[in-house]
From Swiss-Prot:
SUPFAM superfamilies in the cross-refs: Tetrahydrobiopterin biosynthesis enzymes-like
GO molecular function, one term: zinc ion binding
Protein name: GTP cyclohydrolase 1
Subunit structure: Toroid-shaped homodecamer, composed of two pentamers of five dimers.
Catalyzed chemical reaction(s): GTP + H2O = 7,8-dihydroneopterin 3'-triphosphate + formate + H(+)
Length: 205
């Protein structure tokens, strides 16, 4: 499944029709009025500007290309071909259904075939996809797909463990529920021992 290319096309189309900052601020004022408050009172006067600025940060992943983040690789690794694993990468996202925060961590591993990538770049890929309106399932697959497309590894493993405030602070109000999603490709999918090793290493994280 290629979750990278279709998203890139949709995002490019959306950017071409992006509303102005003034239109975005006006939309925030409308929401404040709808919620029952006065957007012209002192405490809320600058709120639309602050919200739009916050959205620029929260959704900065739309302006970044995960494949470019993985563009530089290193082949001189003394023949290293075992698992490369990063644990506890912070995930700060928003659910696409309610725009409520998703907070958690991602654990990512891959088996290099031709080259390795700087470890910070893997964390950057997680950040790019998390800084978008997401479902956790889609984000998990996108991380694996980006690594696969950019590096052609022998396998990728991704596990995301997060809490969704659309469930913890509204609706059913279950604050202690975590959601875990996984994607395994290549040797991680086909080799049960390798998958088990990945899961055992997570216990030490």
């Amino acid at each position: 499944m290629d979750a990278v290319t279709p998203d890139a096309a949709r995002i490019a189309a959306a950017i071409n029709t992006k509303p102005s900052r003034e239109e975005a601020e006006a939309a925030v004022r409308t929401l404040i009025s709808w919620a029952g408050d006065d957007p012209t009172r002192e405490g809320l006067l600058d709120t639309p500007k602050r919200v739009v600025k916050a959205y620029e940060e929260w959704f900065s992943g739309y302006d970044a290309d995960p494949l470019k983040a993985l563009g530089k690789t290193f082949e001189d690794v003394q023949g290293y071909d075992d698992m490369v694993m990063l644990t506890n990468i912070d995930v700060e996202s928003h659910c696409e259904h309610h725009l409520a925060p998703i907070m958690g961590v991602a654990h990512v591993a891959y088996l290099p075939s031709k080259a390795v990538v700087g470890i910070s770049k893997i964390a950057r890929v997680v950040e790019i996809f998390s800084k978008r309106m997401q479902t956790q399932e889609t984000m998990t697959a996108q991380i694996a797909d980006a690594l696969t497309e950019a590096m052609e590894p022998r396998g990728v493993a991704v596990l995301v463990d997060a809490k969704h405030q659309c469930m913890t602070t509204r609706g059913v109000h279950h604050p202690n529920v975590s959601t875990i999603t996984t994607t395994f490709t290549g040797e991680f999918r086909n080799d049960r021992d390798l998958k088990d090793r990945f899961m055992r290493l997570l216990e030490r994280a």
